[in-house]
């Protein structure tokens, strides 16, 4: 470990631009917190550009909370109504706002994440999600 202490690693940014676009899928408390942490990073220019949730009230509350809790990052939040997606397929529309190399935050119940994860990887996106990535269905004993 000490041999690597003096090595400087380059910052990694999305191809073609220094701007890293972020989409949030799952706008509850954990997703909102993860988006806020992403916006607070000093690693590079980051912008929240799309949000998706099954419940309109969750998405609205998340957007309001982000703008109030992170006033220094308000310029990094660019999620107009046309990039706010409601419903079970909203994750696809939110990810479609991104380019390969951008980031999607998956903060949904684990039962749905594997489908979203597959879509994100197929689009060339980086993914942030917490464990468990997915859950196994119940099995019969014996």
Residue ranges and their predicted role:
Residues 1-125, 142:
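N-terminal glycine-/serine-/threonine-rich beta1-alpha1-beta2 phosphate-ribose binding loop
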Residues 126, 133-142:
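A contiguous active-site-proximal alpha/beta segment in oxidoreductase catalytic domains
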């Amino acid at each position: 470990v000490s041999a690597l202490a003096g090595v400087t690693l380059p910052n990694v940014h999305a191809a073609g631009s220094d701007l890293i676009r972020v989409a949030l899928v799952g706008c509850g408390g954990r997703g909102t917190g993860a988006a806020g942490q992403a916006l607070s990073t000093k690693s590079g220019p980051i912008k929240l550009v799309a949000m998706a949730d099954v419940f309109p009230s969750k998405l609205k509350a998340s957007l309001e909370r982000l703008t109030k809790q992170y006033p220094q990052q308000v310029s990094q939040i660019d999620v107009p109504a046309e990039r706010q997606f409601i419903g079970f397929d909203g994750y696809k529309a939110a990810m479609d706002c991104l380019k390969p190399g951008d980031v999607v935050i998956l903060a949904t119940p684990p039962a749905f994440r594997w489908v979203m994860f597959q879509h994100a990887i197929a689009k060339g996106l980086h993914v942030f999600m917490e464990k468990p990535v997915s859950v196994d269905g119940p099995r019969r004993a014996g």
